[in-house]
């Protein structure tokens, strides 16, 4: 009996092992080199332990193969992925061969029935739907429209200063949480600009908006578990769909959108004139043109909201980190800002006239890219060369991983890559040159470049102008000294958080 039991157990274990490794020869059969995958975790050894950020696993592979191949085959658990090693090939994926890599991988994991809001975000949309939605949204994010809401930016900047001054009066040995402060700023900004409502983020009794935003972005285990299941058993992706926007968060924003729409329509019906042509105004016009209900209006408005909250706050917090660590850079920036101030504020047109500020933004994005990698989906098979290896075909449906972090932290392209050196971006068209080489894609590239890039940049610059012109930024001892990323986060951030000591000038 014992022998029979052991035999059955051995057969089951053997069968399970065979199932788990059955396609690990996928890339070898196609002549594509790459590291040997490990059971369950594939080429992401920290998938389960989360001892370090996943991008470091990819960086190890990148450095192992960068001088030999343009791309190598890897596995996310059992799912084959093509890891792009050559930045020139990365640019082909985003630009010249865009039609072959049109969609983002997440599109195959999102279903409109289970996650209507995120499924209708341009990031998730595919094919003609993406093209139509982007064409609809783009006119709402022109520089002209961003300029009309700039007075809101100045108003929120004033609230930011008042909040910081209050924190300084209260005092804390841990200093100020830079991410929390930045998220208060972006939540207040975006809520007013997009919905015409106040979030009261800087008050003692904020509305639930910011907590709902935190609920939206602070769910790493949801995505890790989903990734593990669908990567280990790819067929499950047809049965299990990822829900990025939790039900309660969607319900909250649907109600909020309804309230914003009713309020604005009532104001317009009463004959109230608005000095600004804001994003809500544009969404309402689009709604009438497309005959959209509140849920559909929210799907459009969430495009503006998602691009403006978390990623913008993350970049802002890390700029303050870098300036706090680099006193000379902070002083140079303060000098540049003060030379353009008028009555304590800066004109909208002058924001683009601050080259050192722009360089600080770009260099921070290089060091702490919010989008540390892009997972593209091959939408049309294509043959590509591979340096020392033979040409091979990337088949339709293959996931193609572009590791932006690896390029931007490579000493070959950026000497002394871990150091904050804004001067890298002071050369004429430096960012454009780096982008065309494929080594710097802070906002992506090609037709699917980040649609909220200009709005986010204006927010970030305005906040930095406000803070650096009025406060000296120092790093609290609670903040780590290196640039190690927090494991398991959707958007990269310094491990342990960023804590600042601010001094009023």
Curated annotation (Swiss-Prot):
Q: Which domain of life is it from?
A: Eukaryota
Task: Give the matching CDD domains.
Answer: CYP6-like (cd11056)
Pfam families in the record: p450 (PF00067)
SUPFAM superfamilies with a match to the protein in the record: Cytochrome P450 (SSF48264)
By sequence similarity, the record places it as follows: Belongs to the cytochrome P450 family.
Role played: May be involved in the metabolism of insect hormones and in the breakdown of synthetic insecticides.
Q: Would you tell me the protein name for this molecule?
A: Probable cytochrome P450 28a5
Source organism of this protein record: Drosophila melanogaster
What does the record give as the organism's lineage?
A: Eukaryota, Metazoa, Ecdysozoa, Arthropoda, Hexapoda
Q: By which gene is this protein encoded?
A: Cyp28a5
């Amino acid at each position: 009996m014992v022998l029979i039991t052991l035999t059955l157990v051995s057969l089951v274990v053997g069968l399970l092992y065979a199932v788990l490794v059955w396609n690990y020869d996928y890339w070898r059969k196609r002549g594509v080199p790459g590291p040997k995958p490990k059971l369950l975790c594939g080429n992401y050894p920290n998938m389960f332990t989360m001892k370090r950020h996943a991008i470091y696993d990819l960086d190890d592979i990148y450095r192992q193969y960068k001088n030999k191949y343009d791309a190598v085959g890897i596995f996310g658990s059992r799912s084959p992925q093509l890891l792009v090693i050559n930045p020139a090939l990365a640019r082909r994926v985003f630009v010249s061969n865009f039609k072959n890599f049109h969609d983002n991988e997440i599109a195959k994991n999102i279903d409109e029935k289970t996650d209507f809001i995120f499924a209708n975000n341009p990031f998730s949309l595919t094919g003609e739907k993406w093209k139509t939605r982007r064409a609809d949204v783009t006119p709402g994010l022109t520089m002209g429209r961003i300029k009309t809401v700039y007075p809101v930016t100045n108003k929120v900047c004033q609230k930011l200063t008042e909040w910081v001054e209050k924190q300084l009066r209260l005092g804390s040995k841990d200093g100020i949480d830079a991410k929390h402060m930045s998220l208060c700023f972006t939540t207040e900004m975006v809520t007013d600009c997009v919905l015409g409502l106040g979030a009261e983020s800087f008050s003692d009794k904020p509305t639930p908006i910011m907590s709902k935003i935190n609920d939206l972005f602070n769910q790493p285990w949801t995505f890790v578990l989903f990734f593990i299941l669908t990567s280990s058993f790819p067929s499950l992706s047809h049965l299990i769909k990822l829900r990025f926007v939790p039900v309660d968060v969607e319900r909250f924003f649907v109600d909020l959108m309804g309230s914003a729409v009713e309020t604005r329509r009532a104001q317009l019906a009463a004959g109230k004139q608005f000095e600004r042509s804001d994003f809500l105004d544009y969404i309402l016009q689009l709604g009438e043109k497309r005959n959209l209900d509140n849920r559909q209006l929210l799907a459009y408005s969430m495009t503006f909201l998602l691009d403006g909250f978390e990623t913008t706050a993350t970049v802002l917090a890390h700029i303050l980190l870098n300036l706090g660590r680099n006193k000379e850079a902070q002083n140079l920036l303060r000098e540049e800002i003060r030379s353009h101030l008028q009555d304590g504020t800066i004109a909208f047109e002058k924001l683009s006239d601050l080259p050192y500020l722009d360089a600080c933004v770009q260099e921070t994005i290089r060091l702490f890219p919010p989008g540390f990698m892009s997972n593209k989906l091959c939408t049309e098979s294509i043959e590509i060369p591979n340096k020392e290896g033979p040409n091979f075909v990337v088949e339709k449906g293959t996931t193609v991983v572009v590791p932006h972090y690896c390029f931007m932290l490579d000493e070959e392209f950026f000497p002394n890559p871990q150091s904050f050196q804004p001067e890298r971006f002071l050369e004429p068209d430096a960012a454009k040159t780096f982008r065309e080489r494929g080594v710097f894609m802070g906002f992506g590239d090609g037709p699917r470049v980040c649609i909220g890039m200009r709005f986010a940049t204006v927010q970030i610059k305005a906040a930095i102008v406000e803070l650096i012109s009025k406060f000296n930024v120092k790093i609290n001892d609670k903040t780590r000294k290196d640039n190690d990323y927090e494991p398991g986060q959707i958007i990269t951030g310094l491990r342990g958080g960023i804590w600042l000591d601010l001094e009023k000038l």
